[in-house]
């Protein structure tokens, strides 16, 4: 259930409006004036609340819905309780998310912690730094020599924007973030604790142990990227580390030097991408995926959670396992191993 103390609705929406905005069909047109100001899981609901149910797996819940309105598929709509305004959509969850973005626009991007506007008197703006009108720099933030922050961008408390870094417009850089040697596009969201542009892991064996291989590249983050809390992105050794437009990266992800990530990829938490890995466009990585250095993942490939990738993955394929292999092969091997173990147990009892 949405808590007004944290997320107050921009305004009330009528069910008829929601139908028009999402493309859903209101099953009973006489209910178009019912108002919505809250969102909740299907099991909760309540007055002025919209819920959704998506897929057969949750179909058993539909009879107990007590919300003002329900988004669901055509096949589930006939089982909805009387008195609930039913909005029929082929993609209920996507329609619900659209309503959430409209009802709670402040949730689309984190807001200033202190409520300040403009540049806080407790921020440090170095000589030659440029902060465009409309940017918000909160207390304790440091904007380095020659750095720039675009209009509408929020820089949170105790964040450091390194010398000559640039951040585009309408972005967000959360508290306790460190940016170095980085060029950031427009509408980029960087959550608290992320560390971007630090040294890549570059060392060479020498006569007295390992010697540092200087990392002299950059990090380039294109427009509309979102980076989760405590994620780390190393700068390139010679070439740049690049995060493509529209890519979404979860918390606690490690991206090594010279990695190139394509457009609109999704990378779940605890993934590790070694140096010089290349991901195509629309790649999806489940949680805890590890990719060895210099591996290439083709466009629209998908890697299951906890996969250990040691070979290139062709475009459009789905891989799983350690070492990762095509998903069907991985599942057949798991089934064969299970069968072998069962046979061995039977043999030992005989």
UniProtKB/Swiss-Prot annotation:
Which terms in the Gene Ontology molecular function aspect does this entry carry?
Answer: N-acyltransferase activity
Source gene?
Answer: lpxD
Record-given protein name? UDP-3-O-acylglucosamine N-acyltransferase
Q: Give the annotated active site.
A: 257 (proton acceptor)
Query: What organism, scientifically named, is this protein from?
Result: Chelativorans sp. (strain BNC1)
Q: Name one GO biological process term.
A: lipid A biosynthetic process
Please indicate if the UniProt record lists Transport as a keyword: no
Role of this protein = Catalyzes the N-acylation of UDP-3-O-acylglucosamine using 3-hydroxyacyl-ACP as the acyl donor. Is involved in the biosynthesis of lipid A, a phosphorylated glycolipid that anchors the lipopolysaccharide to the outer membrane of the cell.
Q: Name one GO cellular component term.
A: membrane
UniProt superkingdom: Bacteria
Family the UniProt entry places it in: Belongs to the transferase hexapeptide repeat family. LpxD subfamily.
């Amino acid at each position: 259930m949405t808590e007004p103390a944290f997320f107050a609705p921009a305004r009330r929406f009528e069910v008829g409006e929601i139908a028009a905005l999402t493309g859903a069909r209101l099953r009973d047109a006489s209910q178009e004036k019912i108002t919505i100001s809250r969102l909740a899981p299907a099991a909760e609901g309540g007055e002025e609340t919209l819920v959704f149910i998506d897929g057969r797996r949750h179909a058993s819940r539909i009879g107990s819905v007590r919300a003002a309105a329900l988004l669901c598929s055509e096949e589930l709509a006939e089982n909805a309780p009387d008195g609930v305004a039913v909005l029929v959509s082929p993609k209920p969850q996507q329609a619900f998310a659209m309503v959430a973005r409209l009802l709670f626009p402040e949730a689309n991007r984190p807001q200033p912690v202190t409520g300040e506007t403009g540049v806080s008197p407790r921020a440090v703006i170095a000589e030659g730094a440029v902060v465009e009108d409309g940017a918000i720099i909160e207390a304790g933030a440091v904007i380095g020599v020659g750095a720039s922050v675009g209009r509408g961008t929020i820089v949170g408390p105790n964040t450091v924007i390194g010398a000559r870094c640039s951040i585009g417009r309408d972005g967000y850089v959360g508290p306790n973030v460190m940016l170095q040697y980085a060029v950031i596009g427009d509408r980029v969201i960087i959550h608290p604790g992320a560390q971007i542009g630090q040294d890549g892991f570059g060392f060479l064996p020498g006569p007295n142990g390992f010697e540092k291989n200087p990392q002299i590249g950059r990090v380039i983050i294109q427009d509309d990227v979102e980076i989760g809390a405590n994620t780390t992105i190393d700068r390139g050794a010679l070439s740049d580390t690049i995060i493509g437009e529209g890519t979404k990266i979860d918390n606690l992800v490690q991206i090594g030097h010279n990695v190139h990530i394509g457009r609109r990829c999704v990378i779940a938490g605890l993934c590790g991408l070694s140096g010089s890995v290349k991901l195509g466009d629309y790649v999806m990585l489940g949680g805890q995926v590890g990719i060895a250095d210099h591996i290439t993942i083709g466009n629209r490939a998908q890697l299951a959670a906890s996969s250990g990738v040691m070979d290139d993955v062709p475009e459009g394929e789905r891989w799983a396992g350690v070492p990762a292999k095509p998903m069907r092969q991985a599942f057949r091997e798991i089934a064969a191993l299970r069968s072998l173990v069962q046979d061995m147990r039977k043999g030992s009892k005989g």
